[in-house]
Amino acid sequence: MPFSPQELLYEGKAKRIYRTADPRVYLCQYKDDATAFNAQKRGSIAGKGEVNCTVSSHVFAYLAQQGIPNHFLAQTGPTEMQVRALHILPLEVVVRNRTAGSLCQRLGLEQGLPIEPPLVEFYYKNDALGDPLVTPDHIRLLHLATPEQVEKLGSLALAVNTHLGNFWRRCRLELVDFKLEFGLDEEGQIWLADEISPDTCRLWDLQGTEPRVLDKDLFRFDLGDPAAGYQEVLQRVLQATDPNLPSPAARERGRG
């Protein structure tokens, strides 16, 4: 059953979240807007909303099959999906498989070095503070999550990393790093939320002699045509997955 938007709950840099007639379901609408460096750089990428919505739908469906609880219910339009209503934790969880981006800048590391085991980092979602890196002790001090929740977030992030790495390899891409967000349901259970797309994953095509960027770094660092890069990721996802996504009834399941 489709759910029409009833009330705008939140508008962020890349998405709008609406209430629906069912209090358990939100409608998530993806935008073409693009930002980088904590919104210091702004623009748009043609077709980004549709790419990110469709890619996220496929990835969330795949992760659900692997036993990762997530908020996705169904894609209801090119740029819209139904999601489980959650209270989003004010944390970003970043998993790094290779050195890249801010990690290299912060620690003076060469880009592209493998990280084994993968590195898990937590960032406080606060635009005014520039989304700072925080430790579990900082999280406890700020009452952002309980120690038990932090431990669960870390273990879930590593599990997602394993399955997500397999998914992107099927698309002939390497998962360099990525960020996740999580939310709590009314019973306090943790669910993977937000999106998983070229906006949130650093993806390198390693088929050539040099890694080729196919993610938001195309926009962030003016490395090429972002719209073309995003469309290529979408086509690879469609080629690598079953296009028939599960229905909301099939997706609605408990944590067990």
Curated annotation (Swiss-Prot):
Keyword Metal-binding (UniProt): no
Keyword list (alphabetical) reads:
ATP-binding, Ligase, Nucleotide-binding, Purine biosynthesis
* EC number from the UniProt entry: 6.3.2.6
Give a yes or no for keyword Ribosomal protein in this entry: no
What molecular function terms (GO) are annotated for this protein? ATP binding; phosphoribosylaminoimidazolesuccinocarboxamide synthase activity
Give one Pfam hit by family name: SAICAR_synt
Q: Which SUPFAM superfamilies match?
A: SAICAR synthase-like (SSF56104)
What top-level branch of life does the organism fall under?
Bacteria
CDD domains reported for this sequence: SAICAR_synt_PurC
Per UniProt, the enzyme's principal EC class comes to ligase
One GO biological process term is:
'de novo' IMP biosynthetic process
Q: Report the catalytic activity.
A: 5-amino-1-(5-phospho-D-ribosyl)imidazole-4-carboxylate + L-aspartate + ATP = (2S)-2-[5-amino-1-(5-phospho-beta-D-ribosyl)imidazole-4-carboxamido]succinate + ADP + phosphate + 2 H(+)
Q: In which pathway does it act?
A: Purine metabolism; IMP biosynthesis via de novo pathway; 5-amino-1-(5-phospho-D-ribosyl)imidazole-4-carboxamide from 5-amino-1-(5-phospho-D-ribosyl)imidazole-4-carboxylate: step 1/2
Family according to the record: Belongs to the SAICAR synthetase family.
Q: What is this protein called?
A: Phosphoribosylaminoimidazole-succinocarboxamide synthase
Instruction: Please report the organism this UniProt entry assigns to the protein.
Output: Synechococcus sp. (strain JA-3-3Ab)
Q: What gene is behind this protein? A: purC
